[in-house]
């Protein structure tokens, strides 16, 4: 049975699916504009996608911009994500730089949740998870498949592997090649929900998989990602439309 996680009074893993909005910007001016544009949008979690920054190779600059986000959204849970090129991100970097950056963000205690890529070396991943939790930051372990949807058993196994590494939240995103692939992801989500003790987050990407971003509460995905000003992944739905649809589904269930 999945246990919930409470971050800044936001309950993840129980009740309605929470909406995370990615903050995508190249520099300080764009970040300021994005923060202004999203401030009244109906989202629950802010995800800062630092890999989109032009200064993504500077840890000091990233810390500065993260502080800006934290100051602008003091009451929202802040998820820090630095997606590497190999998993669909905008910045290719070494393992050494990646974990040095994560450690710096963890030590700063600016984010409430930190994204850690599962397949980055088990020892380093476990150390990052432990360091995050020691500093009061939830660890979200993730994996992304941008070209295929693995079999149901493999998806469930990866989510379980994340939990075994100590994750507070387990996330996987896959790319469907058919409608059947979307059903595979949803079936895997339902199965993982039955087995996992931590909140899980799943999505089938692209237009074909968009329905998975709306069905989390039914199948067991705790967070859905909706675009604020710019998509950070294929198939994201605008935050306002996403909220309206989730409200409609919830209210129409009576």
From Swiss-Prot:
Top-level lineage group: Bacteria
Gene3D superfamilies xref list: Aldolase class I
An MF annotation (GO) of this entry: 3-dehydroquinate dehydratase activity
Pathway involvement of the protein, from the record: Metabolic intermediate biosynthesis; chorismate biosynthesis; chorismate from D-erythrose 4-phosphate and phosphoenolpyruvate: step 3/7
EC top class named in words: lyase
GO biological process per UniProt: 3,4-dihydroxybenzoate biosynthetic process; amino acid biosynthetic process; aromatic amino acid family biosynthetic process; chorismate biosynthetic process
Keyword entries, A-Z: Amino-acid biosynthesis, Aromatic amino acid biosynthesis, Lyase, Schiff base
Purpose of the protein: Involved in the third step of the chorismate pathway, which leads to the biosynthesis of aromatic amino acids. Catalyzes the cis-dehydration of 3-dehydroquinate (DHQ) and introduces the first double bond of the aromatic ring to yield 3-dehydroshikimate.
Protein's name in the database: 3-dehydroquinate dehydratase
Organism: Neisseria meningitidis serogroup B (strain ATCC BAA-335 / MC58)
Gene field: aroD
């Amino acid at each position: 049975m999945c246990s919930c996680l409470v971050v800044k009074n936001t309950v993840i893993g129980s009740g309605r699916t929470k909406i995370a909005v990615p903050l995508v910007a190249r520099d300080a001016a764009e970040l300021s504009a994005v923060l202004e544009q999203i401030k009244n949008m109906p989202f629950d979690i802010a995800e800062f996608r630092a890999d989109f920054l032009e200064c993504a190779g500077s840890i000091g600059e990233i810390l500065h911009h993260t502080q800006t986000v934290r100051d602008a959204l003091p009451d929202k849970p802040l998820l820090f994500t630095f997606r590497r090129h190999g998993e669909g991100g905008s910045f290719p970097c070494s393992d050494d730089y990646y974990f040095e950056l994560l450690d710096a963000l963890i030590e700063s205690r600016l984010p409430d949740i930190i994204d850690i890529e599962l397949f980055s070396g088990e020892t380093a991943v476990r150390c990052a998870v432990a360091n995050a939790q020691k500093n009061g930051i939830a660890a979200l372990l993730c994996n992304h498949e941008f070209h295929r949807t693995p079999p149901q058993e493999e998806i469930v196994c990866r989510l379980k592997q994340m939990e075994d590494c100590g994750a507070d939240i387990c996330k996987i995103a896959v790319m469907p090649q058919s409608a059947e692939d979307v059903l595979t992801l949803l079936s895997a989500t339902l199965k993982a929900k039955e087995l996992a003790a931590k909140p899980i987050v799943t999505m089938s990407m692209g237009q074909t998989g968009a329905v998975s971003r709306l069905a989390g509460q039914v199948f067991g995905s705790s967070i859905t990602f909706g675009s604020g000003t710019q998509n950070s992944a294929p198939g994201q739905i605008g935050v306002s439309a996403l909220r309206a649809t989730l409200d409609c589904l919830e209210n129409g269930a009576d």
